[in-house]
Amino acid sequence: MKILIFGLPGSGKTTLARPFAKLINGIHINGDDVRQRYCDWDFTLTGRYNQMRRMSHVADGVVFAGKTAIVDFVCPTNKFRELFNADYTVYMDTIDKSRYKDTNEMFEKPHSCDYHVSEWFGDTHKQLSKVLKHFIAKREEKHNDYPWMDALKDS
């Protein structure tokens, strides 16, 4: 499974992603860490598109290895989010503007997301609990769409 946590810089993406990954025994992939490691693209739309492709490729490798990838980065446009093709998305909508003018101008509010964090309580555990409850409910809902999966458990 590929989970995308996105939003403006400073919105709490990494603060949520790190403990979320630990709780579900997933692999956390942070956009800043990946960008810093390679440092080969700028922050233009093209550079951000290339970063999104790289993040998606790394996450796909984690999923292929049988783990859950929890990816956090800005992912500024609806098209990028669509191309990233996450199984579950969390939109961190906790700030109106970041300190980066170009990112503010480029960032598009999402057409859709699985979970929308509109305020940060200052309590990571409380916020994480809300996201996790929704995530589990969503997975159970998807599981109910495939009743044949129960038969696999019994074999």
Language model segments and positions:
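Walker A (P-loop) ATP-phosphate-binding motif of ABC ATPase nucleotide-binding domains
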Residues: K2
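The conserved Walker
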Residues: L8-P9
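Short, structured coil segments at secondary-structure junctions
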Residues: I24, N85-D87, S112
